[in-house]
């Protein structure tokens, strides 16, 4: 199949034809396209979200693989990586295999999964996973030290020391975030950083980094809807974090859904988490349309850099790479979730200028501007089902 339209290709915008099946087979100037996108629509490499809590399994009342990945496709994301803290947790050989099968059956986007810290490192390391997630409570564990020494796979760090989980939320200070960096070494990615100092030190230590939109935009923790880990920081800290948008490697959603009943509990009892996986892509490209960010930086943040961190052939319009695309237009609208089980977020009604018109996954339309189609994504880390390069 041939598609044609304006595209971000070779570091510029040009009208090109792209031949696709599951992969990008050819790129040239002209063709007789099967699909031709409108003049006001722009073809981009599909976004990659390295930090999504899909839930499912015994937590399906919060969110399922189908609803989370449908919401991701609606937000222009072609690949999500799932966190292991569902129920039961994904931290054994058997649970990793079960989790992969759950995604194979129900995912509307391509996917990868992280394992939790485990005693079964040698067995799990043989499986097609994205890497491992290290939580604050893991930092003092012997298994974490073994993991850091033995596994070459990516380790994603929640940057807070164990003490942060034992003190009142108002005392979960920035120094606890910075101190956590010194517990780890090697192939480490530091996620949902909340302040600029942590970004600088993490980069000095050779780690890749990300931030979330809500740590930039949400005006303090006012209630259960805005409660999140790590906590939303004060105004000046959030203002400083905007500098990080030009230095971090990627932007993630940290999509963390909970039921309405859970979010209606007393503030001290309600679980933390904001679920807006579909917000990140239109938000970042809205900054481009506002001339606050250039398009090359936006594509690097959402597509090219996460693919490099994960060491997979995604994130670029390039022959041999996976045929995942986001098609956007300049269009004023106000944000709402659409396919997620979560219907209320602190980002609701946020004004955006970029709108996702289509999401293409594995060469097939996953989101057509109105509906998510019943396609099946693949495990981006399973080389047997992946790509020819």
From Swiss-Prot:
- For the ligand (Zn(2+) 2), the binding residues are 133, 158, 192
Q: Which co-factor is required?
A: Zn(2+)
- Which residue positions are annotated as catalytic? 254
Pfam families linked = Amidohydro_1
* One annotated GO molecular function: zinc ion binding
List, in alphabetical order, the GO biological process terms annotated in this UniProt record: 'de novo' UMP biosynthetic process; purine nucleobase catabolic process
Reaction equations catalysed: (S)-dihydroorotate + H2O = N-carbamoyl-L-aspartate + H(+)
Recorded hits in PROSITE patterns, A to Z, give: DIHYDROOROTASE_1 (PS00482), DIHYDROOROTASE_2 (PS00483)
Q: Which residues bind Zn(2+) 1?
A: 51, 53, 133, 254
| Chain sites annotated for binding substrate | 53-55, 85, 258, 272-273
Enzyme Commission number, as recorded: 3.5.2.3
Q: Which UniProt keywords apply?
A: Hydrolase, Metal-binding, Pyrimidine biosynthesis, Zinc
Keyword Cell membrane among record annotations: no
Q: How many cofactor units bind, and how?
A: Binds 2 Zn(2+) ions per subunit.
Q: Which InterPro entries match?
A: Amidohydro-rel (IPR006680), DHOase (IPR004722), DHOase/Allantoinase_Hydrolase (IPR050138), Dihydroorotase_CS (IPR002195), Metal-dep_hydrolase_composite (IPR011059), Metal_Hydrolase (IPR032466)
Q: List residues modified as N6-carboxylysine.
A: 133
**Has UniProt tagged this entry with the keyword Zinc?**
yes
Pathway connected to this protein: Pyrimidine metabolism; UMP biosynthesis via de novo pathway; (S)-dihydroorotate from bicarbonate: step 3/3
Domain of life of the organism encoding this protein: Archaea
GO cellular component assignments:
cytoplasm
Transmembrane annotation, as ranges: none
Which family would the database say this protein is a member of? Answer: Belongs to the metallo-dependent hydrolases superfamily. DHOase family. Class I DHOase subfamily.
Q: What does this protein do?
A: Catalyzes the reversible cyclization of carbamoyl aspartate to dihydroorotate.
Extract the PANTHER family matched here: ALLANTOINASE (PTHR43668:SF2)
User: Which named protein is this?
Assistant: Dihydroorotase
């Amino acid at each position: 199949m041939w598609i044609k339209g304006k595209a971000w290709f070779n570091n510029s915008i040009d009208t090109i034809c792209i031949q696709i099946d599951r992969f990008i087979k050819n790129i040239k100037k002209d063709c007789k396209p099967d699909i031709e996108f409108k003049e006001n629509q722009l073809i981009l490499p599909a976004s990659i979200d390295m930090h999504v809590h899909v839930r499912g399994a015994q937590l399906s009342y919060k969110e399922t693989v189908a609803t989370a990945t449908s919401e991701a496709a609606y937000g222009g994301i072609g690949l999500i990586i799932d966190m292991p803290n569902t129920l039961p947790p994904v931290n054994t050989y058997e649970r990793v295999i079960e989790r992969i099968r759950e995604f194979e059956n129900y995912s509307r986007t391509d996917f990868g999964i992280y394992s939790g810290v485990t005693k079964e490192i040698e067995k799990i390391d043989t499986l097609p996973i994205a890497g491992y997630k290290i939580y604050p409570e893991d930092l003092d564990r012997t298994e974490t030290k073994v993991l850091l020494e033995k596994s070459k796979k990516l380790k994603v760090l929640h940057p807070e020391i164990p003490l942060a989980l034992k003190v009142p939320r108002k005392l979960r200070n920035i120094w606890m975030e910075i101190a956590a960096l010194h517990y780890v070494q090697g192939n480490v990615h530091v996620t949902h950083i909340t302040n600029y100092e942590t970004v600088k030190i993490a980069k000095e230590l050779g780690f890749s980094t990300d931030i979330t939109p809500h740590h930039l935009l949400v005006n303090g923790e006012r209630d259960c809807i805005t409660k999140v880990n790590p906590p939303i920081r004060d105004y000046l800290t959030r203002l400083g974090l905007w500098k990080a948008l030009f230095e971090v490697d990627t932007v993630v959603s940290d999509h963390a859904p909970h039921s309405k009943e859970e979010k209606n509990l007393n503030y001290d009892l309600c679980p933390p988490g904001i679920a807006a996986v579909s917000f990140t892509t239109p938000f970042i490209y809205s900054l481009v349309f506002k001339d606050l960010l250039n398009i090359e930086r936006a594509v690097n943040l959402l597509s090219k850099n996460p693919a490099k961190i994960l060491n997979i052939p995604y994130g670029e319009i390039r022959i041999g790479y996976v045929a995942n695309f986001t098609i956007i237009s300049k269009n004023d609208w106000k944000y709402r979730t659409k396919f997620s089980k979560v219907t209320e977020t602190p980002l609701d009604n946020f004004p955006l200028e970029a709108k996702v018109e289509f999401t293409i996954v594995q060469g097939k339309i996953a989101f057509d501007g109105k509906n998510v189609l019943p396609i099946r994504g693949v495990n981006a880390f399973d080389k047997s089902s992946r790509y020819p390069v």
